[in-house]
Each structure stands twice: as C-alpha cells, then as structure tokens.
Amino acid sequence: VIHATDGHAEWTASRQPQVVILGHFDGIHAGHVKVIERGLKYGREHGLPVALMTFHPHPKAVFGDERYARCLTPPKEKERVLAQLGIDRLYIIDFNLSFAQLQARKFADCLCNLGVKHAVVGFDNRFGHRGEGSAELLAEWGEGCFTVDIVSAHNDDDAKVSSTRIRQCLAEGEITKANQLLARPYLLRGTVIHGDARGRTIGFPTANVDPDEPYVIPRNGVYAVKVKVGGMWHDGVMNIGLKPTFKSGETRPSIEAHLFDFDADIYGEEVTIAVMDFLRAEQKFDGIAALVAQITADAEEARRRLASMEGAPALESVFQG
C-alpha cells in the first residue's frame, strides 16, 4: 500500500511498468469487480503488475457532504477485499482541497511518470479539477505513454450498479438487494466491548460491537447475521438501534449480536459481521416479557432464513476465508 499525501510526488518512487485501475471503488461492488477483473486480465496477459489507485477520504466528504464521511468499504476493509481479488499494489491518494485543484491533464502526466502502460477506467470516471477529465480524455492524453480500456456500465434490473444505490438499500433495510449489488454480504468489522450486560439477564447474551472504521451503518432494526470469531463463522441475530424499551434520548445506535449456540467470553476480540437479511424495524415493547417473546421469534426466523441461504455461490468465498 502506497499512501500519497501531496497528490503525486510519492508516486514516482514506485515507478515501474504497470497496469493501473482508476476509481474511488467505495463498496467494491459487482460493477467495480468488472472493472478490476479487466485490469487483472490485461496484467496477466502482458506480464505486468496490477495496481489500483483510489482516494480517501471520499471526495464528496471533502466538499461537505457528511453522509460520505462513512464508507461501504473504509480503507482497511478496501485493502482486504482488493488483496483477495489479486491486486498487487494499492495507491491511496489523500484527497484534500489541494489535490482537488490538480488539473486533469497534470493527473494524466502523473500516471505517465509512474510508469503506467495501461489504465482501466469505468465509462463514467471523472478526474482532475472540477471533474474536467473523462475516460475519453485520458485515452487521448495517454497516447504514446499508456493505453486506456474504458469499461461500460454494469447493470442490474436495467439500472446501473452503483455505490449510491447500495447506500440507499442499507438506509432502507433492503439488505438482500444491497448484497446482490455487492455480489457478497455487506460486512462490518469491529471490537467487542462491554455493554450494559442486559441481554444475558434475559437469556440472550449479546456481543456489543464497536466498528473499527467509519462504516455505513444499515438502518436501525433486527437482522439475520453471520459472525466470524477467532476464524469460525457463527449464525446469529443482530440489533442495530437505540434500545427504546430501556432507554430514551439515546442518539448513537448500538450494534449488538446474539450468536446461536455460543457462550464464550469474547470481550476485546475483533469480529466480522456479515449482514445477511433484514427481519424487522426496531420497536419499543411494553415490558421485558414482550421483548423476550419477540427476540425468541426473531432468533427462530433468523435461523430459518440463514439455513435457506446455505451454499449460495456468492457467499462461499466470504465464509471459506
């Protein structure tokens, strides 16, 4: 991983003939994978290492849209997924107001100075000051230095697969659709912290998870999940929310997962949560008995839905690793 803090000076330190795949790639969804696979294929055929160049923080966050302070794949998560896909090198450009002033033609020159022989971009890729650079202009400016492969849109139900659509799905609890667009389950990683231990007193001990990075958090509600602890995956049910039965005035949602047939002490451990399906919205109950009855029903429904997903091809690569 190479971090460039001023936009381009550090790039030349790693100058060598290479393929570079360009884009933000938040989520690394099915459309992104199509672009990445084109770059990997070219690299294999021509004996060249394949790099991916991305930006952090999200450009929209830099320009004031706080929704984009959270990512579908924050930096470490993105690094993990790209390594699994076979990317040899990752350039993370520190996107700031200074870099945003970089002229598009200058950016193309930087790629040439980096030793790029072939660039792969999505059809709608924009770069440079005010997004003045396009895939077509990159191909024109790269003549004599590098070739450019422009990858067409990847559609699902006649609409382009996009990070924006996935964010919207997560905000609405449309987890099945989000996972379909991602071509894998949506993942959250975090550390198990001490909570109020109320779950254990009512027969449903939970792991309170503090996310390790600024992930986009799905809407408040109850979910069927798989949780990876110490290299093993466990089925479970998760609640994201404000726990209105017990608290009022809370504004920061908590993430609590109850793992089925599991009773180990995992405080302080890092866990990975694969969000598999949305069960219901969060609700306030009149008392403990009503809450316990609903959690029992949620657990049964989560078991049923998770059992129906066993062996699904899109899930196998995640749960075998």
Where are these regions (language model features)?
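Short acidic-hydrophobic, aromatic-tinged amphipathic segments that line or gate anion-handling sites
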Residues: 1-10, 70, 91
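N-terminal catalytic cores of NTP/NDP-binding nucleotidyl/phosphoryl-transfer enzymes
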Residues: 10-74
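Residues at the starts of beta-strands that form the adenosine-phosphate
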Residues: 47-51, 88-89, 117, 147
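Glycine-rich, highly charged phosphate/nucleotide-binding loops
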Residues: 70-78, 100-107
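ATP-dependent adenylation/nucleotidyltransferase module used to activate substrates
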Residues: 82-83
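Divalent metal-dependent hydrolysis catalytic cores, especially in the metallo-beta-lactamase
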Residues: 88-93, 97, 117-121
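Classical nucleotidyltransferase
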Residues: 101-205, 286-292, 315-316, 320
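Phosphate/ribose-recognition catalytic cores of enzymes acting on nucleotide-derived substrates
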Residues: 195-321
